[in-house]
Amino acid sequence: MSKTNVVIEQTEKFGAHNYHPLPIVISKAEGVWVHDPEGNKYLDMLSAYSALNQGHRHPRIIQALKDQADKVTLTSRAFYNDQLGEFYEKLSAVTGKEMILPMNTGAEAVETALKAVRRWAYDVKKVPENQAEIIVCEGNFHGRTVTVTSFSSAEEYRRGFGPFTPGFKIIPYGDIEALKQAITPNTAAFMLEPIQGEAGIIIPQEGFLKQAQEVCKANNVLLVSDEIQTGFGRTGKMFASDWENVVPDMYIMGKALGGGVFPISAVAADKEILSVFEPGSHGSTFGGNPLGCAVAVAAMDVLADEGLVQRSLEMGAYFMEKLKEINNPIIKEIRGRGLFIGLELTTAARPYCEKLKELGLLCKETHETTIRFAPPLVISKEDLDWAIDRIKQVLHVTE
């Protein structure tokens, strides 16, 4: 039995079956390329759901990890550590926000944001206790915790996990009139993904984010942008909200903030919002740990120094252009910004992902019928052309 089959069998035997991965084992990775135990080489076009914007094992990020691991890895927040302040200052500069609150995973950052906007509603907006409402969108994906699952509109994420947390309203994504109608004096925030990733790379109609910002401002409602998957250059801008020159009241960040090396997430907002927390009101033993902070600083430096945001914009435009050349009636729509692209089919997408895997290209279906392409932003034009050739080979139909 091959090493790959041994690992898959072992994983399936002892692990809970909460994922349905493609049948490949990755044992080595560098840049945009990964290898299986048998030495076969694959181009990664998923980037761990956009956590690998800087590529696998970027040498500067790995060096930052090694250097910090030789000094101190964890202090808890019972003490200061010498990496946290620099991380705060750099992320504050990137977001333009006055305060940062660090966590580890994206879902933790979302939970942090929910707690922050609720307490802001009570302490600042003076909403009656336990009456705060938060508006979210259909098709949302903000994580897997019970509270976040409570406002999911996907039955597969909710089945068997009730009772659910109250206090949320769901409106159609991109519907400004629905947002206006959903707001009441008790509304604390409107939280959304500026581009919905898990829903299939869904982009709201142009102007929606700007209109939403204006509606929120007029009603003293916080606009919260979940940039966990879209942030740090993925869409060809630092944040997807930048496409409409919208600066939300709060950013939620994760994934690529850790450079594909270490889990670190954060919420960024101004003091009026994050000052609602006092010692003991929220925390995380590992949040803001020196190892994660050192890695995140290096990850942000790599994005800036290597011009990866602009690279995403340029390579993404080229990629979209080439995908639109594919002649096949099963292609329903191609959507995307930067290197965040969804190719929606009229049939199941997984068989095509499996065919691409056999040709050495790794991608994954989302919402059954959409193939998500999100390669590391460091991808070269040569490697992108290599990928395009294989995508055309699998999807192209000659007349």
UniProtKB/Swiss-Prot annotation:
GO terms for biological process: L-proline biosynthetic process. Catalyzes the interconversion of ornithine to glutamate semialdehyde. InterPro entries: Aminotrans_3 (IPR005814), Aminotrans_3_PPA_site (IPR049704), Class-III_PLP-dep_AT (IPR050103), Orn_aminotrans (IPR010164), Ornith_aminotrans_bact (IPR034757), PyrdxlP-dep_Trfase (IPR015424), PyrdxlP-dep_Trfase_major (IPR015421), PyrdxlP-dep_Trfase_small (IPR015422). Pfam families: Aminotran_3. Its cofactor is pyridoxal 5'-phosphate. It is found in: Cytoplasm. One of its GO terms (cellular component) is cytoplasm. The keyword Transferase applies. Its EC number is 2.6.1.13. This is Ornithine aminotransferase. It is an enzyme of class 2 (transferase). The modification N6-(pyridoxal phosphate)lysine is found at residue 255. Keywords: Amino-acid biosynthesis, Aminotransferase, Cytoplasm, Proline biosynthesis, Pyridoxal phosphate, Transferase.
